Regions:
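Residue-level detector of the transmembrane beta-barrel scaffold of outer-membrane proteins
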Residues: 12-14, 28, 37-41, 87-93, ...
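Gram-negative (and chloroplast) outer-membrane scaffold detector with strong preference
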Residues: 60-76, 87, 214-218
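Solvent-exposed loop/turn segments connecting transmembrane beta-strands
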Residues: 1, 5-9, 14-27, 32, ...
Length: 313
């Protein structure tokens, strides 16, 4: 991926390529010179999707390269004073992708899906020191609504989210508690969740009503300050203990009676992250990488996975 920024820092742009079994191209830019902030992204490559083709439908469709466009605009109001960082961010987002969507009402396919999303976020937390992993004290609240105004097959998704930060038992330790609630109105299709299921579960599980509570305790382990030539600089090792709880509800049709019933699920997971903050080849952007181990009591499974993130700001 290529990144660029103008001298004032008001305009940033990116362009990249990836291989996902097919050629995929990505590009975007963000302009912060005037309010509201404007953000544009486009992804191109692969065949566009055909959503829910009936078995008895033999209609020939001309598939094109998949194109997804996201346009976002927001105003980052800031009321920061002294030690407290305070802000309020209203946002609107428009997305389009050129999939085929089947409608049982018209018994035909509709080309292209348009999605509108609106959100507001408010936050207030203490400024962090260099060694802090999370704010020592603070709160974040957010509410969002998403719908498909030109695709009658979908309903809407609405969610509310809150997160609180509290100090840990030692310096630079942090306790983070969060809770979220989501409701989806279903018409012809059930859409994917906007929230993440507990760690260790897949986000493509069906859901109509979902509530989630999470607890994370983050702590620094050591500061090796070690480098191997110009290739790797290891700055810090950290750990994170977590526990996730969720209640999920959705409707389903019984195979025998064909009656519609509600299914209630209780989901739980817990685990640990071991992470390292590193710089590779003297690149300025820090890389956070490590291992996550999740235990799911429902299935008694232990699931290891790799974590990787890059901070570009």
């Amino acid at each position: 991926m290529l990144l660029s920024q103008d001298l004032t820092g008001n305009l940033t742009s990116s362009a990249g390529y990836s291989w996902r079994g097919y050629n995929a191209f990505h590009a975007g830019f963000t302009y912060k010179g005037l309010y509201p902030v404007f953000d544009f992204k486009i992804n191109y490559g692969g065949k566009n999707s055909i959503i829910e083709r009936p078995n008895d439908n033999t209609q020939t469709l001309s598939q094109h390269n998949r194109t997804q466009i996201d346009v976002r605009s927001y105003i980052p109001f800031s009321f920061t004073r002294s030690r407290w960082i305070t802000g309020f961010v209203p946002q609107i987002k428009l997305s389009y992708h050129n999939s085929y969507l089947y409608s049982s009402i018209t018994a035909d396919f509709q080309y292209g899906m348009w999605e509108m999303g609106y959100s507001v976020q408010a936050y207030r937390y203490l400024k962090m020191s260099v060694r802090d992993l999370q704010p020592r004290l603070g709160i974040v609240v957010q509410s969002a609504y998403k719908h498909w105004p030109w695709n009658a097959q979908f309903g809407y998704i609405y969610y509310m989210y809150g997160r609180a930060y509290l100090p840990g038992v030692a310096p630079h330790h942090s306790l983070r508690m969060s809770g979220a609630w989501q409701k989806q109105e279903i018409k012809e299709y059930r859409f994917g969740t906007w929230l993440s299921f507990p760690r260790g579960y897949y986000n493509h599980l069906p859901t109509e009503k979902l509530s989630i509570e999470t607890i994370d305790y983050s702590l620094p382990i050591c500061y090796p300050d070690w480098n191997w030539s110009f290739l790797v600089y290891l700055k810090r090792l950290t750990g994170n203990l977590f526990c996730d709880l969720a209640q999920n509800q959705y409707r389903y049709v019984e195979n025998v009676t064909k009656q519609v019933r509600w299914r209630h699920e209780k989901l739980c997971s817990m685990g640990i992250d071991l992470l390292a903050d590193v710089h590779l080849m003297q690149i300025t952007f820090p890389i956070n990488m490590g291992i996550r181990t999740v235990y799911v009591p429902e299935t008694r499974e232990i699931q290891p996975s790799l974590l990787l993130s890059v901070a570009f700001n």
